[in-house]
Structure formats: C-alpha cells, structure tokens
From Swiss-Prot:
Belongs to the GcvP family. C-terminal subunit subfamily. Its EC number is 1.4.4.2. The gene is gcvPB. This is Probable glycine dehydrogenase (decarboxylating) subunit 2. The modification N6-(pyridoxal phosphate)lysine is found at residue 263. The glycine cleavage system catalyzes the degradation of glycine. The P protein binds the alpha-amino group of glycine through its pyridoxal phosphate cofactor; CO(2) is released and the remaining methylamine moiety is then transferred to the lipoamide cofactor of the H protein. It comes from Francisella tularensis subsp. novicida (strain U112).
Length: 481
C-alpha cells in the first residue's frame, strides 16, 4: 500500500501559514489550478509507514547478498562517520577551492591511490556512476582517434563475457559493437579476434577477470594485437575487487579504465547512496580526461577546469562529482592501506573458491570446473532444469524465502540457467554455508515436488510476480482513482 492510499479525511499535521509569494511573473500555463494530491497523514503515521517499508527491504546490513559482478560488500560505518563530519557534509558545491583545502587534499590523494592501484598516470573523479565512467572512457577513445584524424575507426570489440553495460556504452558513444565469442575454457577466442581487427577498430572493451569469473590468460597477446591494429584497450573495473595489489590493468596493456567505487571501495550501492565511477588513463589519453580534476599549484589544491585541460571531453555534471561518495572511498582506502586492499582481494577470491568447491562437492555443476574462480563463479542449473523442470528463477525465488538474496541470474548469457555467485571478502564461512545448504535443500525439494518451487516465494510481502505483465504494462506512478 502506498501512503496516498492510507489517507482518511483531514489527518494532515498543522502547518503554520506562510505569506503568499508574488506569482505575477510566472506564466499562467505553469500555475497550478488544483490542489496537489498529497497524503494526509499525521507525522507518527508517516514515520511508521516508512519504518515498516524499510523492514521489508533486502540489504547487505541484514542478509547475505551474493549478487555476481556487483561486489555487495559491507560498507564500513567508520567511512560513513568521518564522511559526515561538518567540514565534508556542509561544504557547498560552489565553495571556493581556498575554503575547502581539506576536501581537495583527500580527493587529490584518492586520485593518486587509484593511479597506484591501477598502474595508470591520470585520474578524473568526475564520473558520478560506473555507467558514466564507461561513457567517459569510450568518449576519450573516440576523442583520441578523432584528434589523430582517424575518423573511420568506429568499431568497438566486445567479448560475450564482458560486462553487460559495455555494448550499450559503445552505442551511446556512436560506435558499432562487434561481438566476439568466449571459448569453452573461459578465455577469449583469439582467432575470432584476429578476424575482426582492422582499420575500423577503435578499441576493445574487456572485464578482467571476466564476467564468467576467470582471469583472461591471453591478455598480453590481446593487448599486443589490438595496439598493432591501432586500437585502444578499455578496462571495465567491475571485477577489480579480485586483483587489487595482485595485478594492475595498466601493466596488462590497458589504456583506460573506470572503477566502481560502490563495489571495489565499499561505498553504498543504489538506493543506499549515489555511485562514483572514476576514470584512469595512461599518457595517451590524459589530455582528454573529463573535468574537473584536483591539481596542485604553489602548495595549494585547485580545481582543474576546461581552461586547464583544453582537449578534455568536458564536464559530466553541473558540479564536481559525488564528493560524499568519493570521501567514503578515500577513507576506505586509508583504513585498509595497500596491504589491506591486497588482503581484501585475497579473501574475496578465497571465499569464491571455497563456495565453488563446496557446491561442486554437493553435486552442483560448475560452468568452468577446470578454472580457478577469481572473486566470483558460475553454477549452471541446466541439469536441474532437464531432470526436474525447475529453472534458475525458481531457485532464486526459493533462496529469497530462506533469507538469502539471489545471485545474478541468466548472466552472462552464454551459460544456460546460470547463477553468478560473488560472496565478497566481508562474508564468513557461516553465511556461505547457509547459502550452500539452502541450495541443497531447494534441489531436494525440486526432486520431490518441483511445483513447490514454481510458487515461491511464500514468506515475502509479495508473491511471485507476473514478469511478462510487468514488462508489457509498466505501472510505476500512483494515480488517484
């Protein structure tokens, strides 16, 4: 029930009357002719309504959240605490650089940390989400070729095991997407790559480790071939949590990347807060970085704008990035340090391999059984589908009934009936075992009563939804009857 439907007459709290403003300068077609439709509820009723809704929310603070390729790790409260200090929290976007030297120093240090972690030489913190970071990265590749007069390079190569947003990003930037396959062992098909490389190649977008959860072993060969063809390498940082302190994209031959701070650096996801997708580049692309960036002149920290970076692809927002998120990421990096970040990747990888081994031990089918998992892995439920008629969706709905958020389903598309599972480093053995036992229990039920799975979930406020109707008859705005 939405709060509007709870209105029962005049229950709204009293509001002190205010002086009416002058509306003479407002066009008449923009003036309201009817009273706004607002819920009439007492303050206590409003508090209760939203508190009850929050209890129905599924979040990392209350449950295991093994959503593959999303890195749903715990967000340390210390980062929230210090990012909420008055000097950070009350900073106005238009405040002068001179008055926010502490904030700028933190951002400057974060830029340097990202350079060191990724092996790149230039960083912009301007992108306000991972997708915007992707856009900035591909836009820089396009700007690089156009500055060289290479206008015919309009193709981006995207493996079928790349992160799902990559093709969309290339399209938004006005480039053509050329898909290449992944081999049965999880590596890119080099022969297929050779066939599509040429004078129209602008670059290739890769996630490494890939979305199938394995490290691309031929990355050095791929980098050499793409560069020899005149293209650039884009690194999607979706899976960077697997290799912090172990390998650097810049050392692999990548020219540009974006990081998802809401994944790798434990800042809040989605409804928990805005994102941040910094971009990092090598010397080839530094002149194209989006502004603003933080620089240092005469021992003072300054904003670098268009006049300082004349070939920049420009601004991505009105202000200077999601600084509240960036400060949280800075604090996370400062708390862990280089050794701590490396250990985080080690434990994330250990947890993924533990879960993969245990599920294999319990008889589940691993998509790439001969490869070590990076920070995530894939279980294919194709045998369960063929034997009992149950799907990955059925398993997912039953997992939610058992207090575990479902892993990513049906992605990557090249593995049938798949669950992409990523435990992250912040989970312990008990929570992972709870998930494993839930999977075993659900499969046991499927053997005896597959229809039971078709009706799940049973213990949630909303039962199984009609996905087809939801897609065809989208209704996301409440209107009075």
């Amino acid at each position: 029930m939405v709060i509007f439907e709870k209105t029962r007459g005049k229950n709204s709290p009293s509001v002190m009357p205010s002086k009416k403003g002058d509306v003479s300068n407002i066009p008449t077609d923009m003036l309201r002719t009817k009273k706004p439709i607002l819920p009439e509820q007492a303050e206590l009723d409003v508090v209760r309504h939203y508190t009850q809704l929050s209890r129905k929310n599924f979040c990392i603070d209350t449950n295991f959240y093994p959503l593959g390729s999303c890195t749903m790790k715990y967000n340390p409260r210390a980062a929230h605490k210090y990012a909420s200090l008055a000097g950070f929290l009350e900073r106005h976007p238009y405040a002068s650089a001179q008055s926010i030297q502490g904030t700028l120093e933190c951002l400057y240090d974060l830029q340097n940390l990202i350079k060191e972690l990724t092996g790149m030489t230039g960083v912009s913190l301007a992108p306000m989400a991972g997708a915007q970071g992707e856009f900035a990265g591909v836009a820089m590749i396009k700007a690089y070729h156009h500055k060289r007069g290479d206008f015919e390079r309009d193709e981006i190569i995207v493996p079928d095991a790349a992160h799902g947003t990559n093709p969309a990003t290339a399209k938004v930037c006005g480039l053509k997407v050329i898909e290449i396959p992944t081999k049965k062992d999880g590596d890119i098909d080099i022969e297929a790559l050779d066939k599509v490389l040429g004078p129209k190649t602008a670059g290739i977008m890769l996630t490494n480790p890939s979305t199938v959860g394995v490290f691309e072993r031929n990355i050095a060969v791929i980098a050499k071939k793409v560069h020899e063809a005149g293209g650039l390498l884009y690194y999607d940082g979706a899976n960077l949590n697997a290799i912090m302190g172990k390998a650097r994209p810049g050392d692999m031959g990548f020219d540009v990347l974006h990081m998802n701070l809401h994944k790798t650096f434990a800042t809040p996801h989605g409804g928990g807060g805005p994102g941040a997708g910094p971009v990092a580049v090598n010397d080839k692309l530094k002149e194209f970085l989006p502004v603003p960036m933080v620089g240092k002149k005469d021992d003072k920290f300054v904003w670098l704008e268009e006049k300082d970076v004349p070939n920049t692809i420009g601004r991505l927002s009105a202000f200077n990035g999601n600084i509240g998120v960036l400060i949280r990421a800075y604090i996370y990096g400062a708390m862990l340090g280089g050794n701590g970040l490396t250990e985080a990747s080690e434990i994330a990888t250990l947890n993924a391999n533990y879960m993969m081994a245990r599920l294999k031990e319990e008889g589940f089918t691993i998509a790439y059984p001969d490869r070590r998992a990076s920070h995530e892995f894939i279980v294919t439920l194709k045998p369960e589908f063929l034997n009992y008629g149950v799907t990955a969706t059925d398993f997912a709905k039953c997992l939610i009934d058992r207090g575990v958020h479902a892993p990513t389903m049906y992605f990557p598309l090249l593995v049938p009936e798949c669950l992409l599972i990523e435990p992250t480093e912040t989970e312990n053995v008990d929570s992972m075992e709870k998930f494993i036992q839930a999977m075993v229990e659900i499969r046991d039920i499927a053997k005896k009563d597959p229809q039971y799975l078709k009706g799940a979930p049973y213990n949630l406020p909303a039962r199984r939804l009609d996905d087809v109707k939801a897609a065809k008859e989208l209704d996301i705005v409440w209107q009075p009857k």
